[in-house]
Amino acid sequence: MVRPSGAEVTYRGNRRYRLVLADDHPDMRQEIQELLDPEFEVLRAVCDGAALVAATLELHPDVVISDIQMPGLDGIEAGTEVLWRGLCEAIVVLSMYSDRHLVQMAMKAGIRAYVLKLDAFDELIPAVYAALRGECYLSAGVRR
């Protein structure tokens, strides 16, 4: 996989930023993991919201990347739980849906970045860094 131009590995102290990834589609998890590595340390890739909460409780990542629509707890519900417990610094939603209502729900829940899966190759890494800096990030497909 060819990396987006301008991407550079950034470290927190002496280590890469660590993340947990959640998506119910195995192929999507694999593609996103390949996109993120080696820039970030992917601690675990899980398939649902409950597993996401459990992984963040165990691993305390810097950032979580989560699909919205997953079995059981959806990405917004799981993200709300993770943020409420103070288990990570930032959450990035990765979704197929650009519905304004979903975007607003995510932002109200404290999720800092919303990236469409169609925009992920070009925008996921910048979105993660923006979220870690405390900034809000909406991918191009959401801003339209």
Give the role of each language-model region.
Residues 48-51, 71-78:
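Acidic catalytic/metal-coordinating carboxylates
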